From Swiss-Prot:
Organism of provenance: Chlorobium chlorochromatii (strain CaD3)
Coiled coil: none
Keyword vocabulary terms for this entry: Cytoplasm, Hydrolase, Metal-binding, Nucleotide-binding
Binding site for a divalent metal cation: D28, D29, S59, N115
This protein's encoding gene: surE
Protein name: 5'-nucleotidase SurE
Subcellular location field: Cytoplasm
Lineage: Bacteria, Pseudomonadati, Chlorobiota, Chlorobiia, Chlorobiales
Metal-binding is among the record's keywords: yes
Reactions it catalyzes: a ribonucleoside 5'-phosphate + H2O = a ribonucleoside + phosphate
Cofactor-binding details, from the entry: Binds 1 divalent metal cation per subunit.
Amino acid sequence: MTHHDAQPSTDAEQSSNATLPHILICNDDGIEADGIHALATAMKKVGRVTVVAPAEPHSAMSHAMTLGRPLRIKEYQKNGRFFGYTVSGTPVDCIKVALSHILTEKPDILVSGINYGSNTATNTLYSGTVAAALEGAIQGITSLAFSLATYENADFTYATKFARKLTKKVLAEGLPADTILSVNIPNVPESQIAGVIIAEQGSSRWEEQAIERHDMFGNPYYWLSGSLQLMDHSMKKDEFAVRHNYVAVTPISCDLTNYAALAGLEKWKLKK
């Protein structure tokens, strides 16, 4: 695969856009998801866009990478026009392949999403959308992840407007090293948005269910399911804020160290 950058529709458009920021877009719902098409359309008003996304949905893949089998890159068209590239792997694979074999230089910013369903609380750990942004941060790229708090009847109107506005702000202000913004947006009209909160990652978690079924030979198999249980009741926490129609903007770090626990553990005086 030869290297490519964003492909505007004409040479004139490419020339006029050459000084605009270059935006790499990814997701975990796959390149056919409505969310990434809405995001790409919005980001084209901010800069030059390159879309590199999984060929198929890879939700809840977290920071998984593909090892032991090849990855394949293909150009993807929407309505007869070039839209982006598919990678036969995970969201993190997409970022790695984009930087090594699709783009000729690092993008100015990486924007992941728009995800179906919130990525708050412990969902942050499972999310391929967030992981793509974290991989961007690991690679030294300013990165954002956007999620819409619904799995059905998604309305991306306000989400894309806010994503565009925040992306411009981050391009102007920057972010601390190894830090992304995970942005969770209620699925309501703009008139019902209560505001924007700089929120902490909450503690809400899934109450798991493994539903047992049987195949034609009588062998059991299982579908993982469950429901997210609200464990925080503070507007400072992401899931609680989103449920009250606030946009939750949460800074997430690549560093998973629990610094508050270090002093106590040092008192254990562990020896070899």
